[in-house]
Amino acid sequence: VTKQSFFEGIKMAKAGNHLFDISNAIDAYIRPYGYGIVRDLVGHGIGTHLHEEPEIPNFAQRRRGLRLQPGMTLAIEPMVNLGTADVRWMKDGWTVISADHSLSAHYENTILITEGEPEILTLRA
């Protein structure tokens, strides 16, 4: 479900669409399964730093967000819990678990917005 939601999201990752079109597509795919869609961790822009603006939620948004333009590089990373959407950080400050200790899944790739279809930069052939 998590992997497929990524591919549903990037169908909307086209120049001229809006950032939250991606979020809404991811949410629309996951929600019927009844899983918790993690809200505390989101996708993000990629540039001179690993984590940059804009933030890309994996859950539905009422706003549209900024307009996607060719050359934008984005990390799209749906995160789904079998139980609650809530998460908590472990003492190491890096490890994140679901608050109810249910199983979780995360799928991530970096994409490039182009004039046509988005290019997946991190997917191996």
Name every feature range the model reports, one short phrase each.
Residues 1-125:
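Active-site neighborhoods and metal-handling regions in enzymes and metal-associated proteins
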